[in-house]
Amino acid sequence: MTEQKRKIEKLTGVKGMNDILPQDAGLWEFFEATVKSLLRAYGYQNIRTPIVEHTQLFTRGIGEVTDIVEKEMYSFTDALNGENLTMRPENTAAVVRASIEHNMLYDGPKRLWYIGPMFRHERPQRGRYRQFHQVGVEALGFAGPDADAEIIMMCQRLWDDLGLTGIKLEINSLGLAEERAAHRVELIKYLEQFADVLDEDAKRRLYTNPLRVLDTKNPALQDIAQNAPKLIDFLGDESRAHFEGLQRLLLANNIPFKINPRLVRGLDYYNLTVFEWVTDKLGAQGTVAAGGRYDPLIEQLGGKPTAACGWAMGIERILELLKEEDLAPEQEGVDVYVVHQGETAREQAFIAAERLRDTGLDVIFHCSADGAPASFKSQMKRADASGAAFAVIFGEEEVANGTVGVKALRGAGAEGEKNVQQTVPVESLTEFLINAMVASAEDGDD
């Protein structure tokens, strides 16, 4: 019997954990460059924490009765030492842990920012993934409403820098612990009247985390949630003054907002100010950035009592908006694609490509796909497909004469009759290319 060749199974990525392909990477780089420039303008410093943390960090920090801890964390036991570990579902707790562990606050407040992947085990859908990326800020050691207003202003400035419109700000105050406790008693009394019509999620939260019932997305419970006792009515003088101070600063800076009494956020560490930036352009996943104040968290994780506030935004959702509004920038090609014909020409072309890179130009050198020399036509086709501005052509005749061919592929120089191959002395190649690119850019601006 003839032995058939076994078919090798094709492996695929994990559902909800997506590859970022080269055609999309340019948009990511554009966003990252824009947000990093903004963060520098506000004096924030980058911090990078591990993807894996002790599970206890999140159960203590986020709260044991939150959806994230109960249902969404990727947790495992380390086979080497039995430690319970978790792939970070968010990064505020990790930044706070790092600031305590490394005594970062001993010499005063800190403005920190992070960017990277987070992980939650949930059903993948548009705008919601199992691996997703966030950029966030943490302002540690600032107690006043001015810090709250500043981090909110940063978001508005980012929307402006990106050209995004239609992202609206909603704010609320969760008050202090004793105010939330008084509200909790009345809220449970109110919700108990509807125990027979509450869905399973609401029943589960009724006595463990009743505040989250107000955030229900179930259409059948909207009237119940809308008419529930409002936490804002339980605020004391200190909490009310903080919230009013925030509103004054936002109004003074022409930032429109809506007070949403049902805005409670899904993490237990928040107090006083909470906020969300929302859009109606992404369907059900309309929150693109969210945050607030978390004054108790640093002490809760073993540090000294320290005020703090921050936000996180979902990068995938913002990129979706950029595409939706046709704001994605065109992906730029390299400056030069080096083409060659003949062995001697190939060696000279290889050397020239390195010298061009020495001057700061971006250069692709044509490498053989199969080990055999490629035709001039196929190389020029590759050069055009690469998006390069110019093709630099080395042939045996040009090398013998100490010259090189240059042909414009993009920009004003590639248009009309003037798009002919020019012969340039090798020693003048760099100067010629730089002058040609400057001239092409100026023609394009006219």
UniProtKB/Swiss-Prot annotation:
- MF terms (GO), sorted A to Z: ATP binding; histidine-tRNA ligase activity
Which Enzyme Commission number(s) are listed?
6.1.1.21
Per the record, the major location class is cytoplasm
Q: Which reaction does it catalyse?
A: tRNA(His) + L-histidine + ATP = L-histidyl-tRNA(His) + AMP + diphosphate + H(+)
Q: What's a single GO CC term here? A: cytoplasm
- Keyword set includes Transport: no
One GO term of the biological process aspect = histidyl-tRNA aminoacylation
User: Main EC class of this protein?
Assistant: ligase
Instruction: State the UniProt keywords alphabetically.
Output: Aminoacyl-tRNA synthetase, ATP-binding, Cytoplasm, Ligase, Nucleotide-binding, Protein biosynthesis
Cross-referenced Pfam families, in alphabetical order?
A: HGTP_anticodon, tRNA-synt_His
Instruction: From the Swiss-Prot or TrEMBL record, state where the protein is found.
Output: Cytoplasm
Supply the HAMAP family for this chain.
His_tRNA_synth
Subunit and partners: Homodimer.
Q: Which family does it belong to?
A: Belongs to the class-II aminoacyl-tRNA synthetase family.
Q: Which NCBIfam families match?
A: hisS
Q: What is this protein called?
A: Histidine--tRNA ligase
